[in-house]
C-alpha cells in the first residue's frame, strides 16, 4: 500500500513471504485500517505480518499468529502511527518500533492499557480454526468503545457487554469454568507455541519463562 487509504475488513492473510519488508502488508504513507483480519504464517525480512513506513494505521479485532521475520519482528513500525487494539498476538516475533497496543493479548506481555498475556484457547489453531473455546480468556476482554458490530464470519458482537478479542466472537458473554493443567519443564524440552490446553510429560518445555507465558490462573508447573 503506497499513498492510499484503504479499509480492510474480514480478510485472511496467510502464508505470504517477502524478501523485503512486510510479509503480508507493507504500508507506505498510508492512512488505512484493518478490522476482523487474520494474519497467519507470514514471513519477511522485517515485519513478518506488517510493516509501516509513514502514515497512520490501525488494527482492530485482528488475530495474528506465527508471523516471523529475519530481524525477529512480527509487526514493525519504522515511522508513523500504528495502533493495535482488541487483538490477539500469539506465537509471533516481536513487536518492533513505537506501536500503541491496548486491550490485546500479547504473548510475553506488552505495555499498554488493559493488555495481558494468556494462552488464547483457540479451537484448533493447527488446522486453522481460530474460533474461541468456551473457557478462552479472550471472551469479554475487549474495549466497549466503538464496538465493531460483527466478527469475520458475520456473527454479531456483544453490544451490551465487552466484546471478545481477535477476529472471532464467541456466543458467550464471559468464559466458562477453566480446568487447570500441569505444565512440564526439563532441560531436554523444547519451547514451542501452544494455543489451547496441550500438555504432555513426554513433551516438556525448556524454560520457566516460556512456560509462564502459557499459564492461566490455576495452572501448575513440574520441573
Give the role of each language-model region.
Residues 1-133:
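Predominantly extracellular beta-rich ligand-binding scaffolds that present long acidic/polar faces
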Residues 6, 32, 57, 143, ...:
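Proline-centered structural pivot motif
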Residues 69, 92-93, 106-112, 126-127, ...:
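Acidic glycine-/aspartate-rich tracts in secreted/extracellular proteins
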Residues 88, 105, 184, 220-222:
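Residues within well-ordered beta-strands of beta-sheet-rich folds
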Residues 119-128, 171-210:
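Right-handed parallel beta-helix/beta-solenoid
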Residues 153, 158, 164, 188-223:
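Acidic Gly/Asp/Thr-rich repetitive segments characteristic of extracellular carbohydrate-active
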Amino acid at each position: 500500500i503506497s499513498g492510499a487509504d484503504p479499509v480492510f475488513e474480514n480478510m485472511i492473510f496467510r502464508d505470504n513471504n517477502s524478501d523485503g519488508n512486510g510479509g503480508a502488508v507493507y504500508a507506505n504513507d498510508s492512512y488505512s485500517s484493518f478490522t476482523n483480519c487474520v494474519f497467519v504464517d507470514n514471513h519477511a525480512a522485517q515485519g513478518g505480518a506488517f510493516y509501516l513506513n509513514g502514515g497512520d494505521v490501525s488494527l482492530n479485532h485482528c488475530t495474528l499468529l506465527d508471523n516471523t521475520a529475519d530481524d525477529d519482528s512480527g509487526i514493525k513500525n519504522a515511522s508513523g502511527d500504528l495502533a493495535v487494539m482488541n487483538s490477539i498476538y500469539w506465537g509471533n516475533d516481536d513487536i518492533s518500533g513505537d506501536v500503541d497496543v491496548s486491550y490485546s493479548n500479547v504473548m510475553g506481555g506488552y505495555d499498554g492499557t488493559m493488555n495481558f498475556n494468556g494462552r488464547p484457547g483457540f479451537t484448533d489453531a493447527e488446522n486453522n480454526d481460530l474460533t474461541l473455546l468456551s473457557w478462552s480468556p479472550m471472551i469479554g476482554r475487549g474495549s466497549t468503545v466503538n464496538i465493531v458490530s460483527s466478527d469475520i464470519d458475520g456473527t454479531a458482537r456483544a453490544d451490551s457487554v465487552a466484546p471478545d478479542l481477535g477476529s472471532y466472537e464467541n456466543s458467550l458473554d464471559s468464559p466458562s469454568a477453566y480446568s487447570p493443567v500441569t505444565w512440564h519443564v526439563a532441560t531436554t524440552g523444547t519451547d514451542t507455541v501452544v494455543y489451547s490446553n496441550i500438555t504432555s510429560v513426554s513433551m516438556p518445555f525448556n524454560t520457566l519463562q516460556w512456560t509462564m507465558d502459557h499459564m492461566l490462573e490455576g495452572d501448575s508447573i513440574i520441573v
